[in-house]
A protein has these predicted regions:
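Conserved catalytic core of the tyrosine transesterase superfamily
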Residues: 1-229
């Protein structure tokens, strides 16, 4: 499936920020360190929210809407129910992510949090549902504590939602590195992300230096093979 010939223009303020791997690690550490005793949110919950949003490429409201019943640990997937465009989907994950979820669930049980199937996965220190704006506010403080900011001219700082964009770009970069046919795999990524049209995936997958580097390496390899033949 070829990429769309003409992609919609993205406004400057909507340009995603793609976190580097070291920045992701700093974010996860900062979630456990910053305002540990003052925040309404358990640091363990905040860290897991960031990790699931990135590792599974979820929208923030999808992460926040997860319930215990949506986790299928034996088969390594989560059920995203009636998300954007009122569509449900299955999002798979690997054993490493499964271990993170297992550890979190055990911690959650030790805290005495409600564990019935209908219970929200993420609860605040009072055992109540967490408000998405509270999470966004906490993320801003975590990001600042981690020392992460934009170096371009954009007036908008990196967002929590950019973790989803980062997942997609890192996935593409891995496919290029593995010499995979990205055009053939893009529909798979589009379905995984819950997009209704392939063009939606193409638009928001910002090309990073790393991704362009992988594409250039592949092109140079192709040219070299042609000369050898």
């Amino acid at each position: 499936v070829p990429l769309p010939a003409h992609l919609p223009k993205r406004l400057e303020h909507m340009t995603p920020y793609i976190y580097s791997k070291p920045e992701l690690q700093r974010l996860f550490r900062s979630a456990m360190e910053y305002q540990k005793n003052r925040s309404k949110i358990h640091p363990e919950c905040m860290k897991m929210i960031l990790q699931l949003t990135y590792f599974l490429g979820l929208r923030l409201h999808e992460t926040m809407s997860l319930r215990i019943r949506d986790l299928n640990q034996p088969d390594l997937y989560v059920h995203i129910r009636e998300s954007k465009f009122y569509k449900s989907r299955i999002v798979t994950y690997n054993h490493k992510v499964g271990e993170l979820i297992d550890t979190f669930l055990k911690w959650r049980e030790k805290q005495g949090m409600c564990c019935v199937p209908e219970s929200k996965l993420f609860l605040d220190k009072k055992g109540l549902d967490m408000h998405i704006d509270t999470v966004r506010g906490a993320f801003e403080r975590i990001r600042e504590h981690a020392g992460i900011s934009r170096s371009d001219k954009s007036p908008f700082q990196p967002r929590l939602h950019d973790l989803r964009h980062t997942f997609a770009v890192h996935r593409l970069t891995s496919w290029y590195r593995e010499n995979q046919d990205v055009q053939q795999l893009l529909p798979v990524l589009s379905t995984y992300l819950g997009h209704t049209h392939l063009s939606h995936t193409s638009v928001y997958l910002t090309m990073t230096d790393g991704l362009l580097g992988e594409a250039n390496n592949r092109f140079e390899s192709y040219i070299k093979q042609g000369k050898d033949e």
